[in-house]
């Protein structure tokens, strides 16, 4: 395993541990680095900010589910995935605004939903509306369910 991946995983593990006891908004990059014995320079070499790290965790752990061809089964898998790490995602989904995980998740789920409903409408505008509606609904439902 490359050193870069080891470093990223150590930072991810530290963030997940910290998020068990405090919200993401209260955790600093310094806290994450202190927890795993790394310096801030190492953190910023790999990630722009703590929100980028949250997105990397999601991408890394979720890629297997996201890449399956059977999207209907994926919805159950998505729920199981979020539930298995609910403390982490409960906190991550509370953040709104720039670089938020909510927006990142919507962006990641968008192509899956687009493929799923792409043939229902003749109009691209109608398809886009439904995909956005479903993505927003998934985020809201996950937040409610995890809380």
Describe the role of every protein-language-model region.
Residues 11, 30-35, 43, 82:
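Append "Primarily bacterial transcriptional regulators
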Residues 17-24, 85, 119:
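Basic, amphipathic alpha-helical hairpins
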Residues 77-80, 97-140:
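Amphipathic alpha-helical packing segments from all-alpha helical-bundle domains
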Residues 28-29, 58-69:
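Short, basic, alpha-helical segments at the C-terminal edge of helix-turn-helix-like DNA-binding modules
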Residues 19-24, 37-54:
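HTH DNA-binding helix-turn interface
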Residues 1-22, 31:
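Basic, helix-initiating cap at the start of DNA-binding domains
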Residues 11, 15, 47, 54-58:
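DNA major-groove recognition helix of helix-turn-helix
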